[in-house]
């Protein structure tokens, strides 16, 4: 299968890389293209890294507002790259501000979408508390 993953921050890069390892174990013919980081590139090949998260991450409302034009351009680039790769599935790793927009677009274009997010600390605490 052809997998396109989008992770926009270091934690997403780690989880995306681990997911890619698991996918490769079950699908030795897996082909990857992704927005991520060095860990994902280590699994999927640096030639398949479309955009490094260091180019896409903007934290805080001021940074986001200052970079709205860049974010819109990156969204367009991402959509074009996904279309060119023609994946069987689009896997969105956390990064909700960007990925929820990509999910909506992908659904409108008939692309299967999975949203992959590791449990947050608060969710883990629910199972370890004495309450």
Question: What spans do the regions from the language model cover?
Answer:
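Active-site and donor-binding regions of nucleotide-sugar-utilizing enzymes
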Residues: 2-129
